[in-house]
């Protein structure tokens, strides 16, 4: 029990690192991501049809505590809000709305139970489903985790929406404490088998850290880093979605091969 308490503290601290800024987020030059991390072959056909026909784009961001920042205006600076801003810039003729549904301290299996009602309530073209951290902390069997994610993906698709999976966030402080690799592999498996995109937040944040774009150790003392990380995640996710939906070629995006 003490072991899980320590793990929970470590992951909670990692979430706080990236949820500490409450100042206005602005675009940053540190957002560079290799194109191979964002561009893939799995298409978002429902998104394409909805945007082309209705010029509206309804998204639900389903996730845990790392979806938003603390404080009364914290939701404004989390990556879902930054995603809405990014998509509005990329698709200026489209009305974009991102609703955030936060379900903290839930496993993927628990989150699946609420997907049907979520689809009825919001009628989205796209669900951005962030999961994995709580399962990793509590040692869910990776095969059971994979099965739960696959079930959730099928529910979303059967409900008439597309899905983008978002995996765990990277923190150098928890890297040696919580084993994430098996869960990252599960995301990749579901992506291949069910032909859905994965926004590899774990690899992207690790890349930024390794390249010195963000000092995620320093984030414990300099919480302003959090707003920049969320801004960059929103921009990168927006680029990935626009590409997967074949809506436009964002400026600076290399041509698809």
Residue ranges and their predicted role:
Residues 28-100, 115-123:
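Serine-esterase "nucleophile elbow" of acetyl-processing enzymes
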Residues 170-257:
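Catalytic His-Asp segment of secreted/periplasmic serine-dependent ester chemistry enzymes
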Residues 29-34, 100-106, 128-137, 192:
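Cell-envelope and extracellular/periplasmic
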Residues 1-12:
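Bacterial N-terminal signal peptides that target proteins for export
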Residues 58-61, 94-122, 134-165:
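Internal alpha/beta domain cores that form substrate/cofactor-binding pockets in large enzymes
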Residues 130-133, 152-184:
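Active-site segments of SGNH/GDSL-like serine hydrolases
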Residues 65-68, 103-109, 132-138, 169-173, ...:
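Solvent-exposed loop/turn segments at secondary-structure junctions
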Residues 10-20:
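Bacterial N-terminal signal peptides
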């Amino acid at each position: 029990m003490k072991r899980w308490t320590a793990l929970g503290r470590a992951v909670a601290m990692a979430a706080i690192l990236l949820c500490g800024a409450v100042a206005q987020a602005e675009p940053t030059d540190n957002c560079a991501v290799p194109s191979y991390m964002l561009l893939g072959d799995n298409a978002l056909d429902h998104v394409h049809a909805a945007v082309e026909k209705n010029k509206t784009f309804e998204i639900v961001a389903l996730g845990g505590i790392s979806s938003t920042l603390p404080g009364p205006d914290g939701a404004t600076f989390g990556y879902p809000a930054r995603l809405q801003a990014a998509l509005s810039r990329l698709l200026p003729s489209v009305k974009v709305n991102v609703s955030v549904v936060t379900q903290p301290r839930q496993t993927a299996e628990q989150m699946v139970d609420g997907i049907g009602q979520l689809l009825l309530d919001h009628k989205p073209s796209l669900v951005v489903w962030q999961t994995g951290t709580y399962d990793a902390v509590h040692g869910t069997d990776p095969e059971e985790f994979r099965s739960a994610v696959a079930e959730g993906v099928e529910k979303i698709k059967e409900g008439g929406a597309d899905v983008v999976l978002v995996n765990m966030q990277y923190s150098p402080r928890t890297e040696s404490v919580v084993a994430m690799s098996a869960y990252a592999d599960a995301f990749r498996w579901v992506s291949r088998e069910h032909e859905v995109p994965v926004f590899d937040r774990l690899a992207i944040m690790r890349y930024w850290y390794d390249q010195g774009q963000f000092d995620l150790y320093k984030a414990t003392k300099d919480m302003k880093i959090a707003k920049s990380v969320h801004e960059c995640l929103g921009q990168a996710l927006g680029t990935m979605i626009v590409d997967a939906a074949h809506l436009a070629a964002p400026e600076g995006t290399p041509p698809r091969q």
